[in-house]
Regions:
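Long, low-complexity intrinsically disordered regions
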Residues: 1-270, 274-276, 282-359
Length: 359
């Protein structure tokens, strides 16, 4: 596969070659998870992928508990279907434990982890803010490192956030509650990792084992890939090295049109990927920022071509786009049109909408 063919294959699976008429929960299931450190980005990501998507669609899904927001892949907050969270969260626990120990180091060795998690598990049968849980843990484990204890709980227990009536369905600092309480059943014990790998390839493939490990946060997936046998195929990548894929997965022609699309910060199709299928090597410093931030991007012809941000007053909404190079007139016109549509989605109360492009 050429790099351009690889680009189109991934965009097709990500619903970025055309907005799809797909039920919201099915779309989130298709993507496996949308990174969601902040409440707003998943809304923009879904708006760019689905026809006629509204804020109310996602707000309804989280309030009816068919979609949840909780700590999962790579120890980060993701939006997932409730079914997928229950199915896969247990499989991710080894990577969360490793991440916790790596970050805390010797601080973790001073803690009685089983006792700490047992206390927190009982506490989170009801919704609580993490500031409150630290106080609670200090009352039970006098002299303990409250920050370290809070991090152990965040990584060690399957918790989800409680939605609210806020504009983006969650407040900036949401309460957490046990997934078992919120969903009425505990997360499943992890069996084989094969189903997770198959779902990853369906959403993000073709890919290498290292790609899957980087996205899930898991290690040593070579045996899992090997065990899937003829449920996988290999295709030669741009550098000649094999990539794994599903036999029937879409691999469109390289000349398939790719419309302008706006992706939010930390969009899951961008994070953890080292190849150049969407972000050219020369542009990576503009995309992958200090503090583990990933910029909000404009895709032009399927590739990262600009960053963007929105500012607003009570009357005016402004979209500021910083392009990586000067665009032809037709491309600029398409970016401006899509950008204004984005503004009207994220700032519907504004009276005027202004899209600015700088290079």
């Amino acid at each position: 596969m050429t790099l351009r063919e690889l680009n189109r294959a991934t965009l097709a699976r990500q619903m970025l070659l055309a907005r799809e008429k797909r039920p919201l929960v099915k779309a989130i299931e298709r993507l496996l998870g949308l990174q969601a450190q902040l409440p707003r980005p998943p809304f923009t990501g879904l708006w760019s992928r689905l026809e006629a998507f509204t804020r109310a669609d996602l707000a309804t899904a989280v309030n009816t508990r068919t979609v949840v927001r909780g700590t999962s892949m790579r120890g980060t907050i993701h939006l997932m279907t409730a079914a997928d969270f229950l199915k896969f969260r247990g499989c991710l626990q080894p990577s969360l434990d490793l991440g916790m120990r790596t970050i805390l180091g010797e601080r973790a060795e001073t803690l009685d982890l089983p006792a700490l998690l047992a206390v927190a598990r009982t506490y989170f049968r009801q919704p609580h803010h993490f500031e409150d849980v630290r106080d609670h843990l200090i009352s039970k484990f006098s002299g303990g490192d409250e920050r370290a204890m809070g991090y152990v709980v965040r990584m060690g227990l399957p918790l989800v956030q409680v939605p609210s009536a806020d504009a983006w369905a969650y407040p900036a600092q949401a309460d957490f509650v046990s997934a078992a309480t919120w969903l009425g059943k505990p997360v499943a014990a992890c069996g084989a990792l094969g189903p997770l790998v198959l779902r990853y390839l369906a959403a993000y493939g073709p890919a290498t084992v290292r790609d899957a490990q980087a996205w899930t946060g898991l290690s040593n997936l070579e045996a899992t890939f090997a065990g899937l046998g003829d449920r996988l195929v290999t295709v030669p990548g741009p550098n000649g090295k094999p990539l794994f894929d599903l036999p029937g997965a879409p691999r469109p022609d390289a000349d398939t049109p790719a419309p302008v699309r706006f992706l939010p910060e930390w969009d899951s199709v961008i994070v953890t990927r080292a190849d150049e299928r969407i972000v050219a090597k020369a542009d990576r410093p503009r995309v992958f920022l200090p503090g583990l931030r990933v910029a909000a991007l404009v895709l032009v012809d399927g590739m990262a071509a600009a960053t963007w941000k929105v500012s607003a007053t009570s009357r005016k909404a402004t979209l500021q786009i910083e392009s990586f190079k000067t665009w032809p007139v037709a491309v600029r016109r398409e970016v401006l049109a899509e950008g204004e549509s984005l503004l009207r989605f994220v700032e519907p109360q504004a009276k005027t909408f202004d899209v600015e492009v700088t290079t």
